[in-house]
């Protein structure tokens, strides 16, 4: 199902800039604001579009693997070196895509048997709440977002949809400051 889109709000109207995505989720601009990265959660991939000076999006392509593997990409953020960090919810993995598009798993908190069962059900269109609930790690169950914080932007915070705390760790690399800072 391709029902996702990217829209821009201009003063009094909304314009759809790109559509045909599979469950559009989070979006991020790179440091130079040359490319917009779009998380396609149930498409299991990240798409990238060139941002033209007039705001139009062109040259759509898949960035990184065309299938990120088990789980579903959710939250993303950039580090200062141009690596796109992201989460795979339901497999509870933290990954990074290098500027060249190579995928590296940085942290794996998943439950392999539960994730395998959920993957099989996803492709059979037979996902149940019980399968989803079983696919939850211990440190960051249903890991859904990632961001860099603290003054040096070297503390990584992992957002999760289950649990009562926010896991974090120190990174040797800083995050990319947000454009609006």
Q: Model regions: which residues?
A:
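Beta-rich, blade/repeat-based domains predominating
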Residues: 1-6, 15-35, 65-86, 91, ...
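Short loop/turn segments immediately following the C-termini of beta-strands
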Residues: 41, 51, 89, 99, ...
């Amino acid at each position: 199902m391709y029902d996702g889109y990217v829209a821009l709000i201009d003063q009094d109207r909304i314009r759809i800039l790109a559509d045909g995505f599979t469950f559009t989720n989070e979006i991020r601009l790179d440091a130079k604001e040359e490319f917009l990265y779009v998380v396609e959660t149930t498409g299991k991939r990240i798409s990238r579009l060139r941002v033209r000076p007039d705001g139009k999006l062109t040259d759509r392509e898949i960035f990184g693997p065309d299938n990120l593997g088990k789980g579903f990409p959710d939250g993303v953020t950039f580090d200062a070196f141009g690596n796109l960090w992201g989460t795979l919810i339901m497999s509870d993995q933290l990954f990074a895509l290098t500027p060249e598009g190579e995928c590296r798993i940085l942290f794996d908190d998943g439950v392999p048997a539960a994730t395998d069962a959920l993957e099989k059900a996803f492709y059979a269109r037979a996902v149940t709440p019980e399968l989803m609930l079983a696919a939850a790690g211990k440190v960051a169950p249903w890991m859904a977002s990632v961001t860099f914080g603290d003054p040096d932007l070297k503390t990584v915070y992992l957002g999760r949809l289950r649990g009562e705390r926010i896991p974090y760790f120190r990174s040797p690399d800083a995050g990319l400051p947000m454009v609006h800072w």
